[in-house]
Amino acid sequence: MSFLNVFSSRPTPKQVAKDRLKVILIHDRGELSDEVLDKIRLEILDVLSKYVEIENEDVDITVTKSNAIEGESPSLVANIPIKNIKGKAR
C-alpha cells in the first residue's frame, strides 16, 4: 500500500490537520489586544528614549500580516521619527 501512496497527490489527514493548526496559531498570534500593544509601545519608547529624542505623538506601532514561506505571519511594524540622537558630539 505504501507504494501507491507515493503516486497519490492527496494530503493525508495528518497533514491537513497540521496545516489547519498552523493557520489557527498564526491567526491567534497576530491578534494582539490594544492593552498589550500599548504596553509594547511604552516599553519600546522607554528603551529608545535612552538613546534618542523622539516625538511620542508621532509614533505609529501596528501589527500587520506579512507573507512568509508557509503562509501569513504577524509582523510588528514601528514608525518612530527621531528628533535628535543623544550624546552625539556636534
UniProtKB/Swiss-Prot annotation:
* Function according to Swiss-Prot or TrEMBL: Prevents the cell division inhibition by proteins MinC and MinD at internal division sites while permitting inhibition at polar sites. This ensures cell division at the proper site by restricting the formation of a division septum at the midpoint of the long axis of the cell.
Q: Name one Pfam family in it.
A: MinE
Which keywords belong to this entry?
A: Cell cycle, Cell division
Cell cycle recorded as keyword: yes
Q: Record the organism.
A: Clostridium perfringens (strain SM101 / Type A)
The record's listing under HAMAP family reads: MinE
Family to which the UniProt record says this protein belongs: Belongs to the MinE family.
Q: Does the keyword Lipid biosynthesis apply?
A: no
Q: Which GO terms describe its biological process?
A: cell division; regulation of division septum assembly
Q: What is this protein called?
A: Cell division topological specificity factor
According to the record, the segments passing through the membrane are none
NCBIfam families per record: minE (TIGR01215)
